[in-house]
Amino acid sequence: MNNAAQNIIKLEEETPMMQQYITIKKEHPDSILFFRMGDFYEMFNEDAKIASRVLEIALTSRNKNKANPTPMCGIPHHSSKPYIATLIKSGKKVAICEQTEDPKLTKGLVKREVVRVVTPGTILDDNLLDPKQNHFLVSLYSNAKGWGFAALDITTGLFKVTEFYGDDRDLLLKDEIEKFDPKEIILSENLVTGCNKPKWLEDRDNSLQSCEDWTFSFKDSYRLLIEHFKTSSLEGFGCEDMKLAISSAGALIQYLHKTQKSALEPVSYTHLRAHET
């Protein structure tokens, strides 16, 4: 029997609630899934083991009488913020899965969906932020000639883009990264797995996030930017001809839409401008 068939059988053996959990978890394999159950966020399996260790909370299990009980742990939803902060500081991402129906008005399984993914560079809650510091999310894109750089402080809307060319482009980029000190850096999958990634970026492995190569498409990125700023070109922002920087900025926006979902609506990134290094 192949692995796919075994997984189907195992899924069918689970309760409807756990089937729902497993399905949602597959969509967020790199995040700790906070699965809302009543007044608690529950975590299961490997997520539970990691969370219990990082948060120093008790690890229990479901189906204790079975041969392979399911590890689990939980936290009260009304006091989740400090727990989320601790996980983020440890380099984790947290996917918040809420009940999207009123259990009192629903027969059977309550619908649930991930409403937001909290990452080191996309924290919006003032209680989780240092008010004395900027909170930059950076996106990088490269070709054989240069680097595209985009930086956004999601809490203020400050959005800067620039490019680096020439023999010292890697050094210039390194200086810029150190200046902005980003909480998170977005790279294309090709850059993460390829040989073009500068060695010094490896020191920031905990803050690196891999995104699909297509999210760095110049054409799509340009369209995203002019649609958001309601303009026909980017000349007024000083970056019309910055193809690498525009590609970086577009991937950054794609990442925000992917992680913030509805929470992105009140976030302003209206202050786009070419950044002088």
Locate predicted features:
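Charged catalytic and DNA/RNA-contacting regions of genome-maintenance
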Residues: 2-273
